[in-house]
Amino acid sequence: MIINKTRDSPSPKTLEVIGIAAVTVNGYIARHSREKTLWSKDLPLFKKQTKNCAVIMGSNTHKTLSDGLPGRKMIIVNRTDNPADILRRIDQKRCFVIGGGKTYSKFSSYLTHLYLTIHPLVFKRGIRLFTKLEKEISISFVRLVPVVAEEGIFQFQFKVE
């Protein structure tokens, strides 16, 4: 699988920067910017994986969170923020980029991993996982985590090469 990435900007420190998302089979993360992803069935896994970690999100994603994200350091970014500066200030071993499409794109050159939970849905239109990317990169499969196996919902974990 190929995903765009800018190679000339390595991740600061040894920080793991994990893009995590619930996506449809045709690559959408939401129907529109105000949608609460009630269709996602991976919330318990998301909570477990992101607990006690920094989570990076755009302002639209932040607005869709009715109760915030207890137990996590929330970092809300805007269009003018520099990803390298934000990542340099994180004093943990890992952080998660949790959306939306512009934010995944903005941090794409810093991602070390992708955790994608594929849901058996097809949206006619909406917000793609990555809205704009600069270059292609390779990712390699690491593991498959059952979410709701009987419904065919699994989290695919990839390492960004």
Task: Show which residues each predicted segment covers.
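Enzymes that bind and transform nitrogen-containing heteroaromatic metabolites
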Residues: M1-E161
